[in-house]
């Protein structure tokens, strides 16, 4: 559970990022594919080249889902329920991949917002992204 101070940190930092949803989401996915090539197997139907319209579109969807999560700290389970169902029952994404993508988002945020990416903001974002990953994998059981 995020503390009020952590929620404030996430809201502040993600507020700056959410206006760049497509850019940051695509960058996080590109970093994921480069750093962890096995993750590409879930996207064999997409053009994964740098700057691909499909990667940008999916990156925006991912970032928009994080915006939804950031707006529903106290009811994240219900806010992300459909997305959790999709990933668990249809896409069957290996749960470890959510952690890998979360790390890539942390790198993107640190790169674009170095002044705001303080140790406390880093810790809060990491905790938030871990919570999102937990929610998305909650229906795997």
Curated annotation (Swiss-Prot):
PROSITE patterns: GLOBIN. Pfam families: Globin. Heme b binds at residue 87. Changing residue 12 to G: In alpha-1 A variant. One of its GO terms (biological process) is hydrogen peroxide catabolic process. Red blood cells. Residues 1-141 form the Globin domain. GO terms for cellular component: blood microparticle; haptoglobin-hemoglobin complex; hemoglobin complex. The keyword Transferase does not apply. Keywords: Heme, Iron, Metal-binding, Oxygen transport, Transport. Involved in oxygen transport from the lung to the various peripheral tissues. Echidnas have a major hemoglobin I (with alpha-1 chain variants A, B, and C) and a minor hemoglobin II (with alpha-2 chain variants A and B). All hemoglobins may have the same beta chain. The sequences of both alpha-1 A and B variants differ from that of the alpha-2 A variant at nine positions. The sequence shown is that of alpha-1 B. Belongs to the globin family. This is Hemoglobin subunit alpha-1. It comes from Tachyglossus aculeatus aculeatus (Southeast Australian short-beaked echidna).
């Amino acid at each position: 559970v995020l503390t009020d101070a952590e929620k404030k940190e996430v809201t502040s930092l993600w507020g700056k990022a959410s206006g760049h949803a497509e850019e940051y989401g695509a960058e996080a996915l590109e970093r994921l594919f480069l750093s962890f090539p096995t993750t590409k197997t879930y996207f064999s139907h997409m053009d994964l080249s740098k700057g691909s319209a499909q990667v940008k579109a999916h990156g925006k969807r991912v970032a928009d889902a994080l915006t939804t999560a950031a707006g529903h700290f106290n009811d994240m389970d219900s806010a992300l329920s459909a997305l959790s169902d999709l990933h668990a029952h249809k896409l069957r994404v290996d749960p470890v991949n959510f952690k890998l993508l979360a790390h890539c988002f942390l790198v993107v945020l640190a790169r674009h917002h170095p002044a705001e990416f303080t140790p406390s903001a880093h810790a809060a974002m990491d905790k938030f992204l871990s919570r999102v990953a937990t929610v998305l994998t909650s229906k795997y059981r």
